[in-house]
Regions:
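A short beta-sheet element
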Residues: 61-124, 137, 248, 260-320, ...
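Amphipathic alpha-helical segments
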Residues: 7-12, 115, 150-187, 191-192, ...
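Acidic, low-complexity, intrinsically disordered peripheral segments
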Residues: 388-403
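A short glycine-rich beta-alpha junction/loop motif
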Residues: 2, 9, 94-100, 133-160, ...
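Sequence-specific dsDNA recognition surfaces
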Residues: 17-28, 32-33, 39-72, 217-267, ...
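Non-catalytic DNA-recognition/assembly elements of restriction-modification systems
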Residues: 1-27, 159, 204-227, 343
Length: 403
């Protein structure tokens, strides 16, 4: 078992079958009705929650009954999991799942928490890769027998160090989950605040003027400038990230070789895909000075007396998204051209109040962006730690806990 290089002298290499046992208990008399599926991202979760319906048969007696803390291995390929996914039952006391998966539990003399991180970090992938030949799949499943599975080689420290490693990585998980929850809380706060500010339910005391109902067409102007200047920054608009470069989003340019007919979009302009606006694909260009978009996009700018950041938040709100279907009702493809956009009603305060509202909501976005940056840093720290701790390249005495 010498393929594990630079292994600390106190560590040893064992077969998975030496420290764990297969779980084969059946769901007799259909006792348990909690049908599970393995999600690469979410782990072992209720099938109805994952698919919004139960896809298993009514007779579950042949399903495997899994207890909390036990593991499942899904041999099928999924994005980011080329050699299958190991997941542990954490969210329920018990559940049943398809006999197609391999189930196992660790012996009492090892730390299951340690091995959860071990598998999450892909430490078993090299072993699985060596066992299965490239392309040796049966209906998308890796050609990995039960015997081969339990013959996988595992590197591990003694029990005390296993527990310390699991404790350290759990601290990072706690910090990550806390940050995720905080981000979600901030998003919900912004959503509620946005709804109240944009409907004048909450107002700043210095503003007393009545809001006026008007049409967007009174304040917008379409821009159709073509790419005669050979601009090469090709952009797309997404509902999640707003403006992105095509290379960044698609990992390649999907534009045609000749972009002379592409539309120019400048900082402060809006753009949207008429056939994707129903899912929120409309954005304000803030990160780049100038770029180009496919001719299918509509590009427009705000005229005076309409703050573009105020309009950005208005487009994000339920006031716009909730009423959008009625403007799409006559369109077979749920498409919104610019002439239809101009007919949409909007209630507006004066320009200074618009700017104040935009300032407050921008501050909310800044907080969320900082938390997202913190989250990404925590995830990178955890990934780096896992790779070093689980190989014995870094020992637990040198690790500071997550802040």
């Amino acid at each position: 078992m010498s393929e594990f290089k630079n292994l600390p002298s106190e560590w040893k290499v064992v077969r998975l079958g030496e420290i764990s046992s297969r779980v084969t208990r059946r769901n007799q008399d259909n006792r348990c009705q909690n049908v599970l599926t393995i999600s690469a991202q979410s782990g072992l979760i209720n099938q109805a929650d994952f698919f919004n319906k139960q896809v298993a048969s009514k007779d579950l007696s042949n399903y495997i009954l899994l207890k909390k803390g036990e593991f499942a291995y899904n041999k099928s390929y999924s994005a980011g999991y080329s050699f299958g996914a190991f997941k542990r039952l954490k969210f329920y006391d018990e559940g049943v799942a398809s006999p197609l998966y391999i189930y196992f539990k660790f012996n009492d003399d090892v730390c299951s928490d340690f091995f959860e991180f071990y598998f999450d970090a892909g430490q078993a992938n090299r072993q699985i890769k060596d066992i299965v030949q490239e392309g040796a799949r049966n209906h998308g499943l890796l050609n990995l027998s039960i015997d081969d599975f339990f013959n996988i080689k595992i590197r591990m420290p003694n029990l005390d160090e296993q527990k310390k490693i699991a404790e350290i990585l759990s601290t990072w998980d706690e910090a990550i989950n806390l940050t995720i929850n905080l981000i979600e809380s901030k998003k919900q706060f912004k959503k509620a605040l946005m709804q109240n500010l944009l409907t004048a339910k909450i107002r700043f005391p210095q503003f007393k003027d009545e809001w006026k109902e008007t049409k967007l067409g009174d304040f917008l102007e379409e821009k159709s400038e073509r790419n005669t200047k050979n601009i090469d920054l090709i952009l797309s608009v997404t509902n999640k990230f707003g403006f992105v470069t095509q290379v960044e989003y698609f990992d390649k340019s999907v534009a045609s070789d000749n972009t002379a007919n592409y539309k120019i979009v400048r900082k402060g302009n809006f753009a949207y895909n008429p056939s994707r606006i129903n899912v929120g694909s409309i954005a304000l260009l803030e990160s780049y000075e100038i770029g180009i978009l496919s001719p299918m996009y509509v590009v427009f700018e705000c005229l005076k007396n309409l703050d573009n950041r105020f309009l950005k938040f208005w487009f994000q709100s339920h006031i716009f998204m909730g009423n959008l279907p009625k403007y799409l009702a006559g369109s077979v493809r749920e498409s919104l051209n610019f002439n239809d956009m101009k007919t949409i009603s909007i209630k507006l305060p004066n320009l200074k109040e618009q700017q104040k509202i935009a300032e407050v909501l921008t501050a909310c976005d800044d907080e969320i962006n900082l938390l997202n940056l913190k989250l990404e840093n925590l995830k990178k720290q955890k990934q780096g730690l896992m790779q070093k701790l689980l190989k014995g390249e870094m020992r637990t005495c040198y690790v500071k806990k997550a802040m």
